[in-house]
Amino acid sequence: MNVYILVVDDEPDVEALFRQQFRRELRAGRFQIEFASSAPDALKRAAEVRDPSLILILSDINMPGMSGLDMLPKVRAAHPDVPVIMITAYGDAETRRKAIERGAVGLLTKPIDFAMLRQEIDTRLEQAA
């Protein structure tokens, strides 16, 4: 099965960072990573994909226009079985509460702990198999 992860972040260097961190997995074809630079773009890309090939969405919270928190209920309504993990520089309790209330399964703080993220992806890959 061809599975992919959708990463949503308005920072241009995020794509290069993720491709570098997951270069072995991407080369081996374990999964694909798609990138969206805004919440509306992410909603469009997610709508073009059929479950269960989309196994995880990682989204920044602070983005111009529609924030990641504003996107959450919309993406959860369209893809209720796809977990969403929010990424933020602000890991305070209030931000975490808002993210969980709106449907996120977790919150990662920047700089991202890629070892922990890799474990999360491995779990999602096992569930998709």
Positions of the model-derived regions?
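Acidic, metal-coordinating helix/loop segments flanking the phosphotransfer/catalytic sites
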Residues: R19, F35-L56, A77
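Active-site T/S-Asp motif of two-component receiver
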Residues: L58-D60
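Alpha4 helix (beta4-alpha4-beta5 surface) of REC/receiver domains from two-component response regulators
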Residues: D70, A77, G91-G106, Q119
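A Lys-centered signature of the CheY-like receiver
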Residues: K110
